[in-house]
Amino acid sequence: MKALLALPLLLLLSTPPCAPQVSGIRGDALERFCLQQPLDCDDIYAQGYQSDGVYLIYPSGPSVPVPVFCDMTTEGGKWTVFQKRFNGSVSFFRGWNDYKLGFGRADGEYWLGLQNMHLLTLKQKYELRVDLEDFENNTAYAKYADFSISPNAVSAEEDGYTLFVAGFEDGGAGDSLSYHSGQKFSTFDRDQDLFVQNCAALSSGAFWFRSCHFANLNGFYLGGSHLSYANGINWAQWKGFYYSLKRTEMKIRRA
């Protein structure tokens, strides 16, 4: 089955989800999605769409379709990708509002948005997989059996979109994320880390920084080895603080 064609994020968010036709999306396919309104890529897979690609999901309800990339092949598929980087075409050194709402395009580099991630993990239990690739074409991954964003908060934003991960499984990458569990998300304009300085500014990114990081997957796209300290796309337990990765994907699937 073919995936829905990608559209710019703002266009999709401003388009009525059950319009008879949207440019780039066949009317019958859109109608089918309007009727069933998938929450995530698990739902899309169950509906018979089992090819990698961009689809619409509805984490906040029927009136707001959100484009997302679904990985339908890795380890059985059904993965909802919330972070994807592979060529440095999109700047990830952004402020709080961008990280809250999401940015980029689902058919390219993008961030799904903290609010969408919170709503997903509020409604279902998820596992997390982090896929990594270096510039020598070596690959590795890390998995976590439990993943959620501020699951018990009255207001997820006031709670800082706190990260919770547990149940690490090594796919060669090592565990660089457990250090960040229990920490609020930080950007250069909203410093919520535990360090005396602003970790997001120091690390040229945005993440669930503590003091500061072992993972910096939203850092600068520096193209491999770099002289600057810990401000690239770093996963310290695999490549250290002086190597910026070529490709990263952070994705969740129902546990």
UniProtKB/Swiss-Prot annotation:
Effect of residue 241 to A: Significant reduction in its interaction with COL1A1 and ELN
UniProtKB keywords: Calcium, Cell adhesion, Extracellular matrix, Glycoprotein, Secreted, Signal
Chief localization: secreted
Motif segment (Cell attachment site): 26-28
Limits of the Fibrinogen C-terminal domain: 32-255
Subcellular location: Secreted, Extracellular space, Extracellular matrix
GO-annotated biological processes: cell adhesion; cellular response to UV-B; elastic fiber assembly; regulation of collagen metabolic process; supramolecular fiber organization; UV protection
Pfam family, one: Fibrinogen_C
CC annotations in GO: collagen-containing extracellular matrix; elastic fiber; extracellular region; extracellular space; microfibril
Signal peptide (residue range): 1-21
Glycosylation sites: 87, 137
Free-text function comment from the UniProt entry: Could be involved in calcium-dependent cell adhesion or intercellular interactions. May contribute to the elastic fiber assembly and/or maintenance.
Cross-referenced PANTHER family: FIBRINOGEN/TENASCIN/ANGIOPOEITIN, MICROFIBRIL-ASSOCIATED GLYCOPROTEIN 4
Quaternary structure note: Homodimer. Can also form higher oligomers. Interacts with FBN1, FBN2 and LOX. Interacts with COL1A1 in a Ca (2+)-dependent manner. Interacts with ELN in a Ca (2+)-dependent manner; this interaction promotes ELN self-assembly.
Protein name, entry field: Microfibril-associated glycoprotein 4
Organism from which the protein derives: Homo sapiens
Gene: MFAP4
